[in-house]
Curated annotation (Swiss-Prot):
Residue numbers spanned by region 11 X 5 AA tandem repeats of M-E-A-R-[AG]: 410-464
One of the GO biological process terms: mRNA 3'-end processing
Protein's name in the database: Cleavage stimulation factor subunit 2
Keyword Repeat included in the entry's annotation: yes
Sequence repeat residue numbers: 410-414, 415-419, 420-424, 425-429, 430-434, 435-439, 440-444, 445-449, 450-454, 455-459, 460-464
Subunit structure: The CSTF complex is composed of CSTF1 (50 kDa subunit), CSTF2 (64 kDa subunit) and CSTF3 (77 kDa subunit). CSTF2 directly interacts with CSTF3, SYMPK and RPO2TC1. Interacts with HSF1 in heat-stressed cells. Interacts with CPSF2, CPSF3 and FIP1L1. Interacts with DDX1.
UniProt region (Interactions with CSTF3 and SYMPK), positions on chain: 108-248
Originating gene: CSTF2
Ranges of Basic and acidic residues composition bias in the record: 360-373
Modified-residue entries (Phosphoserine), positions: S14, S519
């Protein structure tokens, strides 16, 4: 016996052990050890667990101090009832049990591998997938939580561990697929990426988990974040209410998921991220920034695009309702700043209808793509000479400020045209009632418009048109004015017919006692006039500090307009 032990410890151990079958699944090793100690001292009792599910297989091995005790246990305990089952006690040295027995204990020459039995590379992915799928949800959640803590606390150690255990990295990726954290298609693309890290186990393409664990790990461990070969739609990532426990599960130590920018800058394509980035998406290993299909379209203002239809990709975003210059430091239209304004073609309930001052053939809901200076012209208020008939340009060449003719009234007419634009913008601002900055801007423009109207009424009184002090002022000035002061090129028809001395239909000067060009309807004081008067007073009371707080374009335009008003009022 001693010679046998020296010759082969495994055989000696098998002779001192018995195989115990038909064990109830709820039985513990301690309970079984108590039963088998009835025939003699028990050295150890080992229940055999399923490596994939972690559940007991229903059999185990009991080791005694000598072979005689083992034989006694087979005679006396075979058929012993335990928890409603008859235990089967047999010789552990039989061929059927020899392989299981060899894996028990440290005395055997075949030391149990910490990774379990050796599996062929072809079967490794399927085996890992089965093992992961058999885990209870609670255990899988706990595993992910522990892995997250491991990566957060010791990123380098976690990386080394996953590099040395590729099957663990593959299992973690598979678990993310099972938990619907990672889409299977994305997981496949991660596995089949080309990497420079040599794979430890080669895998054949099979099912969703078609690459071997070595392939999975070598990819997962890669610290690079290359983009996926083709753009993925947003629906490719599923969270389904899973907590962000995997946010850093394979971060830092594994392939840290690239933070996808949450803001889309400019009209160019950008990576799209829901709710602040993909990092909160439970850190898919090595995912990198995933270009979304919806990010391939130039990201122009959605509300403007909805009103005007899609613009060509090479057309810059129209600048906005404040008439921002193209170099507006805010980097966008007022729509993108406020987000609460009406669509571009909106005129408000008092005067709905399509704007009549657009180039024919262009969508009347907004300015043409090349018009970037100001918002759409609106129909004038009822104050502005409605009885004259259609508001299309009826003035002919004398009112085209580009020519510089008729120096007597061009300055006042250009300023009046700008005032009409301001009133149109004021109408939209009064309808929106949303943004303080826009309201203040509109008030300033309305104040300037009303000042111009009063000034023109004085200059166009019984004395007739008075030459402007500076001579002709082109009404097509584009400068930094916050409103479109006129039209250039194809927008010439945006000039609104207002007071002039001659050449207008039903709007000539109506005697010395009435300001020229005013229709009878304009002499009626409406609540809107009172409101505008209050706004004028507010703007006139703006201090230099308040004006200095405005954006550069608006501030400069206000100063220029004030200078113009002062020069006009100081004229003889």
């Amino acid at each position: 016996m001693a010679g046998l032990t020296v010759r082969d410890p495994a055989v000696d151990r098998s002779l001192r052990s018995v195989f115990v079958g038909n064990i109830p699944y709820e039985a513990t090793e301690e309970q079984l050890k108590d039963i088998f100690s009835e025939v003699g001292p028990v050295v150890s009792f080992r229940l055999v667990y399923d490596r994939e599910t972690g559940k007991p297989k229903g059999y185990g091995f009991c080791e005694y101090q000598d072979q005689e005790t083992a034989l006694s246990a087979m005679r006396n305990l075979n058929g012993r009832e335990f928890s409603g089952r008859a235990l089967r006690v047999d010789n552990a040295a039989s061929e059927k049990n020899k392989e299981e027995l060899k894996s028990l204990g440290t005395g055997a020459p075949v030391i149990e591998s910490p990774y379990g039995e050796t599996i062929s590379p072809e079967d490794a992915p399927e085996s890992i997938s089965k093992a992961v799928a058999s885990l209870p949800p609670e255990q899988m959640f706990e595993l992910m939580k522990q892995m997250k803590l491991c990566v957060q606390n010791s990123p380098q150690e976690a990386r080394n561990m996953l590099l040395q255990n590729p099957q663990l990295a593959y299992a973690l990726l598979q678990a993310q697929v099972v938990m619907r954290i990672v889409d299977p298609e994305i997981a496949l693309k991660i596995l089949h990426r080309q990497t420079n890290i040599p794979t430890l186990i080669a895998g054949n393409p099979q099912t969703v988990h078609s690459a071997g664990p070595g392939s999975g790990s070598s990819v997962s461990m890669n610290q690079q974040n290359p983009q996926t070969p083709q753009a993925q739609t947003l629906s490719g990532m599923h969270v389904n209410g899973a907590p962000p426990l995997m946010q850093a599960s394979l971060q830092a130590g594994v392939a840290a998921p690239g933070q996808i920018p949450a803001t889309v800058t400019g009209p160019g394509p950008g990576s799209l991220a829901p709710a602040g980035g993909m990092q909160a998406q439970v850190g898919m290993p090595g995912s990198g920034p995933v270009s979304m299909e919806r990010g391939q379209v130039p990201m122009q203002d959605p509300r403007a695009a909805m009103q005007r239809g899609p613009l060509p990709a090479n057309v810059p975003t129209p600048r906005g309702l404040l008439g921002d210059a193209p170099n507006d430091p805010r980097g966008g239209t007022l729509l993108s700043v406020t987000g609460e304004v009406e669509p571009r073609g909106y005129l408000g309930p008092p005067h709905q209808g399509p704007p009549m001052h657009h180039v024919p053939g262009h969508d009347s809901r907004g300015p043409p793509p090349h018009e970037m200076r100001g918002g759409p012209l609106t129909e004038p208020r009822p104050l502005m000479a409605e009885p004259r008939g259609p508001m299309i340009d009826q003035r002919g060449p004398p009112l085209d400020g580009r020519g510089g003719r008729d120096p007597r009234g061009i300055d006042a007419r250009a300023m009046e045209a700008r005032g009409l634009d301001a009133r149109g913008l004021e109408a939209r601002a009064m309808e929106a009632r949303a943004m303080e900055a826009r309201a203040m801007e509109a008030r300033a423009m309305e104040a300037r418009a009303m000042e111009v109207r009063g000034m023109e009424a004085r200059s166009m009184d019984t004395r007739g048109p008075v030459p402007g002090p500076r001579g002709p002022m082109p009404s097509g000035i584009q400068g930094p004015s916050p409103i479109n002061m006129g039209a250039v090129g194809p927008q010439g028809s945006r000039q609104v017919p207002v007071m002039q001395g001659a050449g207008m239909q039903g709007a000539s000067i109506q005697g010395g006692g009435q300001p020229g060009g005013f229709s009878p309807g304009q002499n009626q004081v409406t609540p809107q006039d009172h409101e505008k008067a209050a706004l004028i007073m507010q703007v006139l009371q703006l201090t230099a500090d308040q004006i200095a707080m405005l954006p550069p374009e608006q501030r400069q335009s206000i100063l220029i307009l004030k200078e113009q008003i002062q020069k006009s009022t100081g004229a003889p």
